[in-house]
Amino acid sequence: MHHKITGIAASSGVAIAKAFIHLEPNVDIEKTSITDVSTEIEKLTAALEKSKEELRAIKDQTEASMGADKAEIFAAHLLVLDDPELVDGIKGKIENEQMNAEYALKEVSDMFVSMFESMDNEYMKERAADIRDVSKRVLGHLIGVETGSLATIAEETVIIAEDLTPSDTAQLNKQFVKGFATDIGGRTSHSAIMSRSLEIPAVVGTKEVTEKIQHGDMVIVDGIEGIVIVNPTEEEVKAYEEKRAAFEKQKQEWAKLVGEPSTTKDGAHVELAANIGTPKDVDGVLANGGEGIGLYRTEFLYMDRDQLPTEEEQFEAYKEVVQRMDGKPVVIRTLDIGGDKELSYLQLPKELNPFLGFRAIRLCLEKQDIFRTQLRALLRASTYGNLKVMFPMIATLEELRQAKAIMQEEKDKLLSEGVDVSDSIEVGIMVEIPSTAVAANLFAKEVDFFSIGTNDLIQYTMAADRMNERVSYLYQPYHPAILRLVDMVIKAAHSEGKWVGMCGEMAGDEVAIPLLLGLGLDEFSMSATSILPARSQLLKLSKEELKPFAQKALMLDTAEEVEQLVKKTYLK
């Protein structure tokens, strides 16, 4: 039957292929009594080790193909497998109740899932999904059942699923998987972000694709408009084949812009930079003509290991990045651990609301030995290129002043040791807390630059967790309140002669770009694959014309009105 389903455009492009329905199998686990406890423990240990091997391989594959930030979720899954509460709980059931490993795994994981899902905090609820995903993998090894890997698909398909886990998305083979559509998800969900890195057309949040589509149905996924067509007519197939060809031609045109500067129609230069997680990610920045790195997430140096990285390890990583960028600006964010990123070896206490808790600069100012080691490595690397330092999650001037004072102390120590340090390192802050945006005029006097972290700024301003499906409709980048905060930050910085960048998903959003350009944003930092489309868009825009347009948008009532105004005026 013919259906037209609308959802959220997550990754641009057009896919036309037969549907592959990806549903999780339900496996009934029965409780059985055992007599040989040691054999059962050995079986569990083997399943845990095989699961770790798989996750390490997936993590490495994801890091190589999509960057360290996309691989972060698998480091979290590995931490679950090493969690003594979970592992010892399962072993305890086997030893004390003489039950089979499969049922012990089910009982303990179900208990943790129920506990996390009952909490009010959305971050803790997300941990339930991690435990469910990891437990499914371990169970598969215990009972010898394939856990539904999509890596084995060997014909052209469009995947239809309720949702795709990070493990699922990381294993997609672009040669055969032409696109996907899901019932749930938003533009900032894991699967959406990964689909953009892989350049696979995707539509998410449709609410009904699994209900309306049968295995083998012909499907069109329009990741440009957010439309899924089931069993299309010949005319629709022809029209979308033309649309797909036009999009591929457009990509070829974008490729010609790799060595070109990012200038507007009226000759204004805007810096298009990239977000990275490891030195390896610089490959993608250079291949896509990035003019700098607007966010180097240093926490990936600290993850998937059992001890803190040394000063020397960090120095080598930072040095490699600034050297390879050959004088182009590299903004390096100091450690942002906490919230959705944990380090097992720090043994931080569990928090009910870690996103608003002991994280980022708050952790660094308390655990100064960690902070000072990182700052020494950054200061040493500063002589090898255009390195800038950025402090995350700054809420007060006192935090900023303390961080700068510690950095100055470490600089003085290095100089006294005869170590060269650049005398022109710019220091800035992430603006991701609404109070910081409102007080930007105060901060602007004491920093060299701002970088607006919209992913957190939006969810904190709208009081809506971007990963929570039930309130995802409130995650509105174009909401007048968000635009006014951005405007406030830019004006405050410019009044002090300072520059402003943006390093959230919003920076690479084609609807947001005209607004941000009109508001005067100086630097747009995005995923490397978004740089060339953004550069192409800038060539068609006039910065001077956009100034009154952006101010007009600030006066509108709703995010929808803002979006429609931009689309009607600039995205016809």
From Swiss-Prot:
The active site is at H190 (tele-phosphohistidine intermediate), C503 (proton donor). Its cofactor is Mg(2+). It catalyses: L-histidyl-[protein] + phosphoenolpyruvate = N(pros)-phospho-L-histidyl-[protein] + pyruvate. SUPFAM superfamilies: Enzyme I of the PEP:sugar phosphotransferase system HPr-binding (sub)domain (SSF47831), Phosphoenolpyruvate/pyruvate domain (SSF51621), Phosphohistidine domain (SSF52009). Its main location: cytoplasm. Its EC number is 2.7.3.9. Phosphoenolpyruvate binds at R297, R333, N455, D456, R466. It is found in: Cytoplasm. Mg(2+) binds at E432, D456. NCBIfam families: PTS_I_fam. General (non sugar-specific) component of the phosphoenolpyruvate-dependent sugar phosphotransferase system (sugar PTS). This major carbohydrate active-transport system catalyzes the phosphorylation of incoming sugar substrates concomitantly with their translocation across the cell membrane. Enzyme I transfers the phosphoryl group from phosphoenolpyruvate (PEP) to the phosphoryl carrier protein (HPr). The N-terminal domain contains the HPr binding site, the central domain the pyrophosphate/phosphate carrier histidine, and the C-terminal domain the pyruvate binding site. The reaction takes place in three steps, mediated by a phosphocarrier histidine residue located on the surface of the central domain. The two first partial reactions are catalyzed at an active site located on the N-terminal domain, and the third partial reaction is catalyzed at an active site located on the C-terminal domain. For catalytic turnover, the central domain swivels from the concave surface of the N-terminal domain to that of the C-terminal domain. Belongs to the PEP-utilizing enzyme family. This is Phosphoenolpyruvate-protein phosphotransferase. It comes from Halalkalibacterium halodurans (strain ATCC BAA-125 / DSM 18197 / FERM 7344 / JCM 9153 / C-125) (Bacillus halodurans).
